Amino acid sequence: MDSNTVSSFQDILMRMSKMQLGSSSEDLNGMIIRLESLKLYRDSLGEAVMRMGDLHSLQSRNEKWREQLSQKFEEIRWLIEEVRHRLKNTENSFEQITFMQALQLLLEVEQEIRTFSFQLI
């Protein structure tokens, strides 16, 4: 994973954790946790691709990896919709910038996961 992506994740997660969105702070914490989870999942797929011999161990260790992949894409779609919704409803420029960067990062992560998964299939 390239260092810009790592710093982007860390920067966005840090800024999102500082936001005070009133009653929706639990939802925001959920988004942060899901983003962190997606980052870890994307990293593990990338590592598996780099060690192509791990494909068989990945499949034998977790025969439901395609199902997991499908769930991750659903999670990404949910997060994208949630970020878009928050982006539409906020007038705070700090939040707008943060959510726009989060949206861009989600789209990049989705593309990377697709690329990795096609290489593993």
From Swiss-Prot:
<comment type="subunit">
    <text>Interacts with protein M1. May interact with host nucleoporin RAB/HRB and exportin XPO1/CRM1.</text>
</comment>
<dbReference type="InterPro" id="IPR000968">
    <property type="entry name" value="Flu_NS2"/>
</dbReference>
<comment type="function">
    <text>Mediates the nuclear export of encapsidated genomic RNAs (ribonucleoproteins, RNPs). Acts as an adapter between viral RNPs complexes and the nuclear export machinery of the cell. Possesses no intrinsic RNA-binding activity, but includes a C-terminal M1-binding domain. This domain is believed to allow recognition of RNPs bound to the protein M1.</text>
</comment>
<comment type="similarity">
    <text>Belongs to the influenza viruses NEP family.</text>
</comment>
<keyword id="KW-0945">Host-virus interaction</keyword>
<keyword id="KW-0813">Transport</keyword>
<protein>
    <recommendedName>
        <fullName>Nuclear export protein</fullName>
    </recommendedName>
</protein>
<dbReference type="Pfam" id="PF00601">
    <property type="entry name" value="Flu_NS2"/>
</dbReference>
<dbReference type="GO" id="GO:0039675">
    <property type="term" value="P:exit of virus from host cell nucleus through nuclear pore"/>
</dbReference>
<keyword id="KW-1048">Host nucleus</keyword>
<dbReference type="GO" id="GO:0042025">
    <property type="term" value="C:host cell nucleus"/>
</dbReference>
<feature type="short sequence motif" description="Nuclear export signal">
    <location>
        <begin position="85"/>
        <end position="94"/>
    </location>
</feature>
<dbReference type="GO" id="GO:0044423">
    <property type="term" value="C:virion component"/>
</dbReference>
<feature type="short sequence motif" description="Nuclear export signal">
    <location>
        <begin position="12"/>
        <end position="21"/>
    </location>
</feature>
<keyword id="KW-0946">Virion</keyword>
